[in-house]
Design a protein with these regions (language model features):
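Post-HEXXH active-site segment of zinc metalloproteases
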Residues: 3-50
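Non-catalytic terminal regions of proteins
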Residues: 132-234
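Intrinsic-disorder/low-complexity loop/linker signature
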Residues: 16, 25, 105, 138, ...
Length: 234
């Protein structure tokens, strides 16, 4: 994802009749001037935009048999693999609402904002393949329809096309408007965030085995438990 999307310069556009990706009836007319790139043009949202583009590319490729074959995902499990990618993304987006500050109206983590944008794209353009449901107990549930992955694909495809298009053709203002809308958090989402915070789990503690050299020059592995005292003793 990070390595994709050509940056159009003057020589790529002027006189080349490059068909506009979003409007095939016209040609591309915008490009980056010499010495100007994506980062400085898109400013403060550039990193988040790029993380979103990379994650969106990864999900898009999870729909492609050619990509899954490379990683030896069996044909009978490829649909489940793709479904797991969608479930992981929407679950992470919900949990990562923690990184949005209602006080400053800013995200503290680019990856978190990027995943939230993907989640909103699935809700907006996924043809009901992904739904956010509030039940009678005031709980929020994310529902993904395993029989409508085509809807997820169309949403991811639309998002990726727009992200690549605005970046490649230096459509700076349109790109910013498009992306800022996806990462914006209104009062409805603040309520979802508040609920997500009640489900926030404690940070995990991971403790690996310890390799020690014995007096006779050999090595042995000490298996340790994950209780605090044992970790400190190691």
């Amino acid at each position: 994802g990070h390595g994709s999307a050509k940056i159009f310069k003057r020589e790529d556009v002027v006189g080349k009749n490059v068909v506009d990706l979003l409007d095939p009836t016209r040609f591309v007319t915008t490009y980056y001037e010499e010495g100007v790139g994506f980062d400085e043009s898109f400013g403060g949202i550039a990193q988040t935009y790029e993380e979103c583009r990379a994650d969106t590319t990864a999900i898009y490729l999870s729909f492609k048999k050619e990509a899954l074959d490379i990683f030896k995902v069996p044909p009978e499990k490829q649909k489940d693999f793709t479904l797991c990618q969608i479930l992981f993304m929407v679950n992470t987006a919900m949990k990562n609402l923690y990184f949005y500050s209602p006080e400053t109206k800013k995200w503290s983590q680019p990856h978190s904002a990027a995943r939230f944008a993907i989640f909103k794209a699935l809700l907006n353009w996924g043809n009901d393949s992904v739904k956010l449901i509030k039940n009678d107990q005031n709980e929020y549930i994310v529902w993904v329809d395993p029989e409508n992955l085509d809807g997820c694909y169309e949403a991811i495809k639309k998002l990726l096309i727009h992200l690549n298009y605005y970046k490649s053709t230096a459509q700076i203002e349109r790109g910013k408007e498009f992306f800022l809308d996806l990462i914006s958090v209104d009062e409805k989402w603040i309520q979802v965030r508040n609920y997500a915070l009640t489900k926030k789990s404690r940070k995990g503690v991971f403790c690996q085995s310890v390799i020690r050299k014995t007096n006779d020059g050999k090595y042995e592995i000490d298996e340790v438990s994950n209780d605090p005292k044992t970790i400190l003793d190691c």
